[in-house]
UniProtKB/Swiss-Prot annotation:
Cofactor binding remark: Binds 1 zinc ion per subunit.
HAMAP family in alphabetical order: AcetylCoA_CT_beta
Family statement: Belongs to the AccD/PCCB family.
Gene Ontology BP annotations: fatty acid biosynthetic process; malonyl-CoA biosynthetic process
Limits of the CoA carboxyltransferase N-terminal domain: 230-497
Subunit structure and binding partners: Acetyl-CoA carboxylase is a heterohexamer composed of biotin carboxyl carrier protein, biotin carboxylase and 2 subunits each of ACCase subunit alpha and ACCase plastid-coded subunit beta (accD).
Protein's UniProt name: Acetyl-coenzyme A carboxylase carboxyl transferase subunit beta, chloroplastic
Basic and acidic residues compositional bias, start-end: 40-50
């Protein structure tokens, strides 16, 4: 049986299809005559760029794809398509990529059911003619170079129809010059001279007149890509990083070294010795204390959404652990939970953590990533600034204990104005956005333009706003040395009771 497979590659705005072909058995399908001319000018251009395999006794060319494919993932997985050839004969195609099977079926009842189901997708003029072939079922296999070219024409046409249904073609492309030599499928599968060599790959690039085509943006596609790829936030990069490899690299862009946002769980894993994390107050929640009114959605519903999305109950995780064997108390804010905004539960969890560290004489580390106080709780969220600052005063001034504040991007608003800037040592990450009020708020309030980079960590470091700028890679070692410098040492087997 002839084997075929497809891979889709999305790279730098271009869609490339790669088709690999290999032969193993002799089989061929009866010819389907190509007697009519496609009225679609775009399709005509496509046919011009595909080798004419006139000597082939078995081929499909100009096959229309009648069933719209909703998702590009369906094309490279097992699926059934409804097509018609230039003689208006209709067939269903079953494409099994795993077992490398390509089957044709012209069963009338099945086609009628498909036509009825997909009627809304296509013009009824496509559905006027029945199948003229008496054979109910075919296996389409490669035989020789001529048949190969017929197969290639058929696959080319299927891909053409699929791309036309999935890709938005710019009006300037559609109205391009008739003298254009490049169709949006500029390379054909048959290769030079129409000969397909065994084991060779061929590229199909979606481009016309040098202009790239763009994929339709659907919420499902965007959600899928967000789960696989992360775009760099640096204005000079915007590179795309594979999510799985990015996690192993501490969420640092592989292309420019920019420090991307991290989930609180990843930061805890980065900072704490494995197996030593002990969370605190995980079940602490609050309701809607001021019954905040919103035209968009209820405050409670919004909290429920972020709880499901992040798996957290609030915008911070607090607990205890060991830093290279040194017991510490640590709190890590999570920007993915409503922008890391501070509300009553966040303030209460931080306050309880500080009090626990005070009573147990533990060094304290707070990792800040927040947009400020949460407006949905009004003054109740603002009062957390004073409550946390009061607890820190007792911890630092009365007990003389050691507190390290780590400012990540972004750290703004009430967090900056309270515990974010109260550390004995204040550490910032590279390129972190640190401010009290955001750039847009300042410009709208003062009616003045804020210079670019004036709220970046590197600029503020030279103004003396904090102590060191420490990348993520050596951060754990730096924290360990600072804690030991202030009189906290690792536990040993003799001190454990």
């Amino acid at each position: 049986m002839e084997k075929s497979w497809f891979n889709l590659i999305l790279s730098k705005g271009e869609l490339e299809y790669r088709c690999g072909l290999s032969k193993s058995m002799d089989s061929r399908l009866g010819p389907v005559e190509n007697t009519t001319v496609n009225e679609d000018p775009t399709r005509n251009d496509t046919d011009k760029n595909i080798h004419d395999c006139s000597d082939s006794s078995s081929y499909y060319s100009k096959v229309d794809h009648l069933v719209d494919v909703k998702d590009i993932r369906n094309f490279i997985s097992d699926d059934t398509f409804l097509i018609r050839d230039s003689n208006q004969d209709r067939y269903s195609i079953y494409f099994d990529s795993e077992n490398q099977i390509f089957e044709l079926n012209n069963d009338h009842s099945f086609l009628s059911e498909l036509e009825s189901f997909f009627y809304s997708y296509h013009n009824s003029s496509y559905m006027n003619n029945g199948s003229k072939n008496d054979e109910p079922h075919y296996h389409f296999n490669l035989y020789d170079n001529d048949t190969n070219c017929g197969w290639n024409n058929h696959i080319n046409s299927c891909i053409d129809s699929y791309l036309r249904s999935q890709i938005c073609i710019d009006s300037s492309i559609l109205s391009g010059s008739d003298n254009s030599n490049d169709n949006y499928i500029s390379n054909y599968i048959c290769g030079e001279g129409g000969n397909s060599s065994e084991g060779k790959n061929f590229d199909i690039i979606t481009r016309e007149n040098g202009n790239d085509l763009t994929l339709k943006e659907s919420s499902n596609d965007l959600d899928l890509y967000k789960d696989l790829w992360v775009q760099c936030e640096c204005e000079n990069c915007y590179g795309v990083n594979y999510k799985k490899s990015l996690n192993s690299k501490m969420n640092i862009c592989e292309q420019c070294g920019y420090h991307l946002k991290m989930r609180s769980s990843d930061r805890i894993e980065l900072s704490i010795d494995p197996g030593t994390w002990g969370p605190m107050d995980e079940d602490m929640i609050s309701l809607d204390p001021i019954e905040f009114q919103s035209e968009e959605e209820l405050y409670k519903d919004r909290i429920d959404f972020y709880q499901r999305k992040t798996g957290l109950t609030e915008a911070i995780q607090t607990g205890t652990g060991q830093l290279n064997g040194i017991p510490i108390a640590i709190g890590v804010m999570d920007f993915q939970f409503m922008g890391g905004s501070m509300r009553s539960v966040v303030g209460e969890k931080i306050t309880r953590l500080i009090e626990y560290a005070t009573n147990n004489f533990l060094p304290l580390i707070l990792v800040c990533a927040s947009g400020g106080a949460r407006m949905q709780e009004g003054s109740l969220s603002l009062m957390q600034m004073a409550k946390i600052s009061s607890a820190l005063y007792d911890y630092q001034s009365n007990k003389k204990l050691f507190y390290v504040s780590i400012l990540t991007s972004p750290t703004t608003g009430g967090v900056t104005a309270s515990f974010g800037m109260l550390g004995d040592i204040i550490i910032a990450e590279p390129n972190a956005y640190i401010a009290f009020a955001g750039k847009r708020v300042i410009e709208q309030t003062l009616n003045k333009t804020i210079p670019e980079g004036s709220q970046a960590a590197e600029y503020l470091f030279h103004k003396g706003l904090f102590d060191p700028i420490v990348p993520r890679n050596p951060l754990k070692g730096v924290l360990s040395e600072l804690v030991q410098l202030h009189g906290f040492f690792p536990l040993n087997q003799y001190s454990i009771k």
